[in-house]
Amino acid sequence: MCDEVSCGYTPSDKPLPEVTDGQRRSFIKGLAVLPLATVLAYPELAKASGHNSTTPVSIKTPSGGTAMGYIAMPDVTPAPTVLLIHEWWGLNDQIKSVAAEFAKQGYIALAVDMYGGEYAADSAGAKKLMNQLDPKAGTEQLVTLIDWLKNHEKSTGKVGTIGWCFGGGWSLNASIATPVDATVIYYGRVNKTADELASLNSPVLGHFGTLDKNINADMVGGFEKAMAAAGKTDLSVNWYEANHAFANPTGARYDEADAALAWERTTAFFKKHLM
């Protein structure tokens, strides 16, 4: 689903969002609120957000395996739910922070850990972890967590999926494997046939970069044609003059304006279909 060219990581050399020492200390203590982009840009803030707002969950799959993740709860329930799927690196504090942000917006948000606690420090490690994941086991993990969210005692029963890069492809895979109410894909692999898309029942929102050489116009165009052939008309594809991983504030490909626009569209999409 990913390779070292498109998903390889180079740290951002852009100026970080301004935050004072006082704001930083207050946020880490859970006494202040900062914009999501600011939290994601600072590892210490992302770590604090994930630690303060999420708790681990572990659920047995039908085959006897384990589906793991971290859940963030909203103040008001019952609430709709969102399943977040990480990039090829593994589950990190940034994704946990996004889960915390969704909880602030009124969702039960669960960030899945598809690698069972492992996290890659470089592209070679990420590729190894990705290749070690059995597709059948990965699908079972996600279906198990989606079913768990639907039946959670504080859930309305509605579920949306969202993923980035590796997770974007898995967001689509999960929605094909089991019914959900909304699917969001950030520059994920979408090379599916009409037959493979036959069981997809949710509306789909996709975010893609025109400079992305892997998840490119040919692949996305083929996806649009396959969706049409399968009779799936509720698809919104958005293009940004940006590269792969443009929504990751810690990477060199980060595009602040496009990331903000994609996030605005994502939250509006979930509000429309889940709330």
Q: Which functions belong to the PLM regions below?
A:
Residues 230-275:
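C-terminal catalytic histidine-bearing segment of alpha/beta-hydrolase fold enzymes
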Residues 45-74:
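N-terminal cap/lid segment of alpha/beta-hydrolase-fold proteins
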Residues 147-152, 156-199:
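Primarily recognizes the serine-hydrolase "nucleophile elbow" in alpha/beta-hydrolase
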Residues 206-208:
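Short beta-strand/loop motif that positions the catalytic acidic residue
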Residues 1-22:
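N-terminal secretory signal peptides
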Residues 79-87:
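Short beta-strand element of the alpha/beta-hydrolase
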Residues 19-46:
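N-terminal export signals
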Residues 129-151:
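Alpha/beta-hydrolase active-site loop
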